[in-house]
């Protein structure tokens, strides 16, 4: 059974949420820019899959598998709900929904981390 590094996953998910929030903010800021295409990030599941088998090299002479580098979050063009005559594909409604999803996911993420932190403290006291 493989160890689950919950706090590492929480930190990686928070980083992914931060990048996604930046992409959403950029989309909202460019809502009236002609020809601007809305952006989004790859799903978090793909980020986890790309770094699943990462090994730690404790010495510079160790051979690594190439997966030890942190996977960069891929920012790509999102599927637009609508495109204006100027070619802009930002939908403010869609971006606000995405921002709400990021907020909800961040609160859930921090709630899980707090619960596990409390469990660790309780087990250390016992």
PLM features: residue spans?
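Amphipathic alpha-helical polymerization modules
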Residues: 1-126
